[in-house]
Amino acid sequence: MLARFLTMAAVTLLAVTMGAAAARAANLVVVEARGIDLKPGAEIDGSKPLALKDGQVVTLISPSGEIIKLHGPSNAAPAPSQGGSTVDVKGALRTLVTQELADNSELGVVRGAADDPVPPQPWLVDVTRDGTRCLPANYPVVFWRPGGGGASAVTIAPYDRSWLVRTEWQAGTDRLPLGAAVPLRNRQTYVIRVGNKETAVTLVTMPAAVSNDAMRAAWMIQVGCVPQVKSLLQAAR
């Protein structure tokens, strides 16, 4: 009797686990939405119809890193065939980066130059050039400059110059960790001066729903953090 009970309990637990996995796999994450009240980072069920009116546009990411772009008018399910299958994250990441960067380069729509330096770690913030940098949610900000360099005075300010932080970059080091006292915010542009060079850097935080490297790569390709995508691919090999 006890053995039968344990067997039934195990089957029930397996069914619940598989059902939860399938539900998670069907979730898509919003990257961008125009004309409709969907926030970046929001999750939607890909198996259910998404009503879009004329002119409304939504860009979504699947758990495998697939980028799904929908244009209204439409009332279709974004990913009706999403199931509970296991995602090969490394394989999906390699395929995504290869295909998306090649396709977008041909179309001239990659946000960020292809020859920009690739950071040795994906989440280092390159402050030597203008552009967008991506970070996981609640990840510490670490500035990076290729090749290190000499001692340099550093200033950080929001675009409206409402505050200013001063610090020092030591000679021979390529990284400068920022403390929690520097109030950096998501999707805000900051003017950063290192020595005599000034750049404008926009920080974009990836939501927790972007939960694997294939999804992170897809997100970063869409917002323009291309060198970081290449670094992520190198780290996954």
What are the functions of these language-model segments?
Residues 8-17:
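Bacterial N-terminal signal peptides
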Residues 179-191:
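Surface-exposed, short loops/turns at beta-strand junctions within beta-sandwich domains
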Residues 138-148:
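Short edge beta-strand/loop segments characteristic of extracellular beta-sandwich folds
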Residues 19-25:
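Sec/Tat signal peptide C-region and signal peptidase I cleavage site
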Residues 25-43, 49, 54, 64-140:
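Flexible, surface-exposed loop/linker segments and immediately adjacent secondary-structure boundaries
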Residues 55, 146-152:
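Short proline/glycine-enriched turn/loop motifs at strand-loop junctions of beta-rich domains
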Residues 147, 196-237:
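Extended, polar beta-sheet/loop recognition surfaces of beta-rich domains
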Residues 159-178:
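Solvent-exposed serine/threonine-rich low-complexity stretches and specific carbohydrate-binding patches
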